[in-house]
Amino acid sequence: MLESHLIIYFLLAVIQFLLGTFTNGIIVVVNGIDLIKHRKMAPLDLLLSCLAVSRIFLQLFIFYINVVVIFLIEFITCSASCAFLVFVNELELWLATWLGVFYCAKVASVLHPLFIWLKMRISKSVPWMILGSLLYVSMICIFHIKYTGFMVPYFLRNLFFQNATIQTEVKQAIQIFSFVAELLVPLLIFLVAVLLLIFSLGRHTRQMRNTVAGSRVPGRGAHISALLSILSFLILYISHYLIKTFLSSLKFHVKRFVFLFCILVIGTYPSGHSLILILGNPKLKQNTKKFLCHSKCCQ
């Protein structure tokens, strides 16, 4: 019989899974309907749709991990499933990184020639960003299968089977390359883009406040809302990275509080940020309301 804290944890995991699947599914469906109506899709909608699809698969895998942890069913550690895990996880991280770059290029006010060039071409570059991410992540998966195929199954066996043993002396160069290629590069790109956007929005908000002191400035609330949305994106993104690094560097018993908390935090990012995207994007929010109202009327 399950302990009380495991029952509570599993209920939270189910709620998290349903919320994440629903919010990301809404993004895909709403943008899909918009594509059918107008026979074209805006670059931001395309990026959001691809990100939502990758997050749905990521939520499915996280929920599968939760089921394995709670009910101790057999975990599949074949090379194909591990390669799929790496593919979905890395693709989601890169698409989220490009989303931060897109917001930065569109919203931030920077007079540097390189930034102006990026601002003018970012919309046309979105399909190439997605294609480049797919190719890059595919190369990472091939690298894992060829050189480090045993590392992911070993990490998973360490979590789920305490008696598992394997030679732990892995080439340091391979480990460093994996860390840089999979975690450090997208993280640095994201940090530069989002911090630049936060500073730009903060500076613009202060200028608006100082220009008309004591009066209500139109658009000021929108800037504050955008700033809070980007800050929440940054917090969720960084916490996601920190927890993953923490999990990969230490050994845990799967039913201990620290491990369960880490898995819950990892699942919060793809579900929580997608909800923030819907609430913070006026077009997406309006189309979601129309879709939900239409669904209720059809019942």
UniProtKB/Swiss-Prot annotation:
Classification via CDD domains: 7tm_TAS2R1
Record's subcellular location: Membrane
TM spans (from-to): 10-30, 56-76, 82-102, 125-145, 179-199, 223-243, 258-278
Extracellular side: 1-9, 77-81, 146-178, 244-257
Glycosylated position list: N163
Top-rank lineage group of the source organism: Eukaryota
Principal location class: membrane
Membrane topology classification: Multi-pass membrane protein
Record-level GO cellular component terms: plasma membrane
Entry keyword set: G-protein coupled receptor, Glycoprotein, Membrane, Receptor, Sensory transduction, Taste, Transducer, Transmembrane, Transmembrane helix
Molecular functions per Gene Ontology: bitter taste receptor activity; G protein-coupled receptor activity
InterPro entries xrefs: TAS2R (IPR007960)
Segments on the Cytoplasmic side according to the record's topology features: 31-55, 103-124, 200-222, 279-299
Ranges in a coiled coil: none
Family to which the UniProt record says this protein belongs: Belongs to the G-protein coupled receptor T2R family.
Record's function text: Receptor that may play a role in the perception of bitterness and is gustducin-linked. May play a role in sensing the chemical composition of the gastrointestinal content. The activity of this receptor may stimulate alpha gustducin, mediate PLC-beta-2 activation and lead to the gating of TRPM5.
Note in the entry: Most taste cells may be activated by a limited number of bitter compounds; individual taste cells can discriminate among bitter stimuli.
Name recorded for this polypeptide: Taste receptor type 2 member 1
Gene name in the database record: TAS2R1
